[in-house]
A protein has these predicted regions:
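Conserved Lys-Pro-Asp/Glu-containing loop-to-beta segment of HAD-superfamily phosphomonoesterases
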Residues: 151-172
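An amphipathic alpha-helix signature
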Residues: 22-30, 62, 66, 124
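A metal-dependent, Asp-based hydrolase signature
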Residues: 41, 48-91
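Hydrophobic "anchor" residues on beta-strands that sit immediately upstream
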Residues: 6-8, 117, 169
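Short, acidic loop-to-helix structural element flanking the phosphoryl-transfer center
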Residues: 59, 77-117, 151, 155
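Active-site neighborhood of HAD-like aspartate-dependent phosphohydrolases
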Residues: 1-44
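Glycine-rich phosphate-binding loop signature in dinucleotide/nucleotide-binding domains
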Residues: 2, 112-114, 161-167
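Substrate-recognition/cap helix-loop segment adjacent to the acidic, metal-dependent catalytic center
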Residues: 107-117, 121-145
Length: 172
């Protein structure tokens, strides 16, 4: 195993903005359903139930919003609302990457002294798109997109990259 120190970085909301776009999309959705009581809580519960089916990411989020729209309308949601929800999702997928302050300078400096790897969770195509558009790939020796971040996943990534856990630090 390598004795070089390695730093792993999460991507969403560690390197670039992400959660803010989900919040904005949720607010647009709520505008379509102003009659709902506690819409954020209802949406959160539907999302939570659906993670096992759709995983994390924009597509699963939009499918959950579509399901919420059907539930909120007693199975009478109209096609215009469905179209608006799909547009919300497409707008999210087309969003430009907004790096968090000083991220690139920090990665540039750290990459001169440490091996950096990116470990991010979410939908494969969406995460690949964000990673490529970020312009940060040049700082990372490896990029891992996973469906869940748990101890087993980290151990598999470390083993695959020949990294000892004692030489590894995860940020985010």
């Amino acid at each position: 195993m390598s004795n070089k120190q390695i730093i792993g970085f999460d991507a969403d909301d560690t390197l670039w903005e992400n959660e803010v776009f989900f919040h904005q999309a949720q607010m647009k959705f709520i505008e379509l359903h102003p009659h709902i009581k506690d819409p954020e809580e209802v949406i959160f519960q539907i999302e939570k139930e659906n993670i096992k089916f759709y995983g994390y990411g924009i597509k699963g989020f939009i499918l959950s919003l579509l399901e919420a729209s059907v539930r909120f309308s007693n199975n009478k949601t109209d096609f215009q609302n469905i179209d608006k929800i799909i547009k919300i999702g497409k707008d999210m997928l087309a969003q430009t990457i907004q790096l968090l302050p000083e991220v690139e300078e920090t990665l540039r400096h750290l990459s001169e002294h440490y091996m950096l790897i990116m470990i991010t969770k979410g939908d494969l195509l969406d995460q690949q798109r964000k990673v490529e558009k970020s312009g940060l790939l040049k700082y990372f020796s490896s990029t891992e997109i996973v469906s869940e971040k748990d101890e087993q996943t980290y151990l598999e990534i470390l083993e695959k990259n020949n990294i000892s856990p004692k030489d590894f630090l995860m940020v985010g």
